[in-house]
Amino acid sequence: MTIVLREMTRDAADAILAGERPGGVRVADDYPTEFSAGVAQCVGAVGQFGPYFLQRAEDDVVVGEIGGAFVDEEGTIEIGYAVVESQWNRGYATGAVEALVTKAREASEVRRIVAHAPLERPESGRVLEKAGFGLVQETEDEDAEGNVVRVKQWELAT
């Protein structure tokens, strides 16, 4: 199944931040995700790469989102993504990461892409591995609520 990246609009982001479903797009029954509000806050921010809705090509239904942000002056972006639980294990996350990597490789300012996968979600690490990322280290990061969590850091040179 194919995923298309569709840029998240300001109107869609405002709806998500208000706790509503975005208008103008069809969404999966269990959308938005816990990740959605954080992604919506990034719309229009300087230094962002995306964010994008993950839209199934066959029916245009939104099943998640993906985006990245520049984290240093050397051209490193850190990406994050989420797929609604009802659509897990269908290749959508891998397709989305691969599509974002393709976009990143087309942008001359992007030199390196990093991602963190929580230890309790090994399937996220497999997604990154399938997309060509290499495991760098196990480290600590903050989750959406500001809690420190153990993660695996993955990296891909462009």
Features from the language model and the residues they span:
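Short loop/turn and capping residues at structural boundaries
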Residues: 98, 115-116, 139-140
